[in-house]
Amino acid sequence: MKTDENHLYRCRKSDFYSKTPRGSCAIALPREEIEVALVDINERRLSYITRIAQRIFAENGIPIERITATTDRRAVLGGSQYIFISILVGDIEAIRKDIEIPLRYGVDQCIGDTIGPGGIFRALRTAPVILDICRDIAELCPEAFVFNYTNPMSILCWVVKEVHPSLRFYSLCHSVQHTAKQIAEYMGWPLEDLEYWVAGINHQAWFLELRLRGRDVYPLLREKAWDPEIAEKDTTRVEMLKHLGYFVTESSGHNSEYNPWFRKRPDLLQRFTPGVGWNGETGFILKLYGKDRESYEQELERIASGAEPLSYEESEEYGMKIIYALEGGGIFRANINLPNRGTITNLPPQCIVEVPCFVEKGRIRPAFVGDLPLQLAALNRMVVQSQEMAVRGILEKCRDYIYYALYYDPLTAAVLSLDEIKRMVDDMFEAEREYLPNEWYHS
């Protein structure tokens, strides 16, 4: 298997604040004491990120000796308190298979990293590696807080909690923050004055409440949905707002894959996924991952060498703010992915939900949400039931459950018959053999 694995942070008695150079990965800058270990099996990539981290430390008066870089995670996991996981298993060719094989059958995906054929096969590739990492964490630093940024977030988190239920494993995404910023821009509101309460599942959470300086402004957003200029910018989410009454997280192109309404016919694709990129372009993920690697590495070299200035701005990502709160820096509220266990009362208790959580010294407490509006819970449950069968298939190495997961996937089921889905899955298993564990091929 081919994997990129990076960013393990180890810290003690630290006072953190978060800075983001050029929108890249957030690095915590300590005022007292911190040790940072960076892990990547790609030595070239590890060299770049290590030099960038050293530059950030040096520019902020932090001894660079506190940074360790290694390709061996077990060498640095012992004593770790906070761990970030961001990996990719397989290369651009694996992702190409995720997109192009379903497309031959008529299943048109924009990103394909969350559910659907692409998301589920990404999970099949990624889950064994995540479980290996978590096995080492359970052995070497079982009390660590583990924050996963890897997709498909919900499936991976669910798999880990089934195998390591006591591990403090959480998944973090930025779709809530990004959506809040987009809403503020659409409406001309100051983001700092916007208050919101969001809950659901990853990439399909719902803005349940929306207030501006304490005033309910959801009626204004619903009215704005009929503005053609806004609808053109955010097609599928605005259409769902019109019909379901609530705004959903994640971009319109990504969102279009998680339901049966927008990508099942050419005329619907033309209507609801116009333009390019995140608004629903077919196979857009291949452009994202297929960028000119030489130019990308040249940019990393310019940053690492100091040829390009670093602009320090507060990160949108939750990670460092969560650590700050866990270290006693006050209470911080963030939307975090974790097992439901009654937080959302009309979703299954074992599923992974994305809900408001209160982070304070030494612990993370999910807020009680209660019932989602029925029309929202119904769509979440469609996705959750597919996730659950994918999780069962991964844990049991049972291909039947992968068939079932895609039989009930909202987009796939809207396009294909049962026998077509089965043939597609078999084609994907055969095409991705080099990326998957041998157990999938023994039956």
Go through the PLM ranges and name each one.
Residues 5-7:
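Conserved beta-strand elements of the Class I
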Residues 17-29:
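Histidine-anchored nucleotide/phosphate-binding helix
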Residues 27-62:
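Glycine-rich phosphate-binding loop and adjoining beta1-alpha1-beta2 segment
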Residues 66-77:
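Short acidic low-complexity segments
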Residues 80:
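An anion/phosphate-binding loop that grips the pyrophosphate of nucleotide cofactors and donors
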Residues 89-164:
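Rossmann-fold NAD(P)-binding glycine/threonine-rich loop
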Residues 145-214:
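Rossmann-fold dinucleotide-binding core
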Residues 188-443:
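Long, compositionally biased stretches enriched for glycine and/or charged residues
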